[in-house]
Design a protein with these regions (language model features):
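A transmembrane-helix-recognition feature enriched in membrane-embedded lipid enzymes
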Residues: 23-91, 136-141
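Generic beta-sheet signal
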Residues: 125, 146, 174, 207-209
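Residue-level preference for the first positions of well-ordered beta-strands
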Residues: 98-100, 168-174, 203
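Soluble, non-transmembrane catalytic domains of enzymes that act on hydrophobic metabolites at membranes
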Residues: 2-29, 84-94, 167, 182, ...
Length: 285
């Protein structure tokens, strides 16, 4: 099943800002021809900062306390950012509303996409918490952090995931452990969180995300590998290049059924990781 998503404007904090920015956006375009790239970058960057500030105000005013409330706040925020950055997307398959979701990982936009389509809980490496903007956003939304090699980290992650499952929220994680540049559909999967999900007897659905540049950006020499997928650049350097894009379209595919792990995978986490990776890659074909 395909579902075309047009991120509609929601009410509440930020509605006036949407109108102001949309008017400015129209002023920056003349008969379909965008203005110079530096101006677009400044406009988009200012818009993103404003959206972030509005989300902060909403968080202070509403003070979400439960994990479900925080996940709902993050979902609204991510939908606004995607709309504000002219990122459209469609969803193929039924959206998982519970259990675990394993996905490929290309860029920080993956997080926005997974959250925008419905509230969810993320499991992420501890380094994300130290990342400007994204770290604060993830912490306030109830993200479960995993510190590799730290004593008790696996137990804490399992406990956090269990709370998400009990709250009826889908728990999303990226087993690659880092972002790739798209040279392969999915890099090797780490086995820890997959094994914990199996031990908790929770279902696990595969997801695959891909991106498509606009014809204008392709003509301008932009590439997914350099301008969308997040490789070795610093976050700020990559963001500055990204905000110069005209538009971007994403597709997120979900498997129709949960992953059916073999008996061997149930008893061997490495085999389980390989089977989960195969399920994700199958969605790229």
């Amino acid at each position: 099943m395909g579902l075309e998503r047009d991120q509609g404007r929601d009410s509440g904090p930020g509605k006036l800002a949407w109108l102001e920015f949309d008017t400015l956006g129209e002023a920056l375009t003349l008969e379909g021809t965008s203005v110079l790239n530096p101006v677009r970058k400044i406009y988009r960057a200012a818009k993103a900062i404003t959206l972030f500030l509005l989300a902060s105000v909403e968080l202070i005013l509403t003070q979400p306390r439960t994990r479900a409330e925080r996940a709902a706040w993050l979902s609204r925020f991510c939908a606004r950012v995607l709309r504000g950055m002219d990122i459209t997307f469609d969803v193929v398959g039924d959206i998982p509303m519970s259990g675990a979701v394993v996905s490929n990982h290309l860029t920080y936009l993956d997080i926005l996409l997974h959250s925008a389509i419905r509230p969810c809980v993320f499991v992420s490496k501890m380094e994300l918490r130290k990342t400007p903007l994204l770290g604060w956003m993830s912490m306030m939304s109830g993200t479960v952090y995993v510190a590799r090699g730290a004593g008790g980290s696996a137990a804490k992650a399992a406990e956090g995931m269990a709370k998400g499952f009990r709250d009826g929220l889908p728990v999303v994680f990226f087993p690659e452990g880092t972002t790739g540049v798209g040279d392969v559909p999915a890099m090797s999967f780490r086995s820890g969180l997959i094994a914990q999900t199996i031990e908790a007897e929770e279902s696990m659905r595969a997801a695959f995300i891909s991106y498509r540049l606009s014809e204008k950006d392709v003509a301008a020499g932009k590439t997914l590998r350099k301008d969308v997928h997040w490789g070795p650049e610093t976050l700020w350097a990559h963001l500055w290049g990204f905000v110069g894009l005209h538009t971007l379209h994403a597709t997120i595919k979900f498997a129709d059924e949960p992953i059916q792990f073999t008996d061997a995978a149930v008893h061997d986490r490495k085999i389980a990781a390989e089977e989960a990776r195969a399920a994700v890659i199958a969605l790229s074909l």
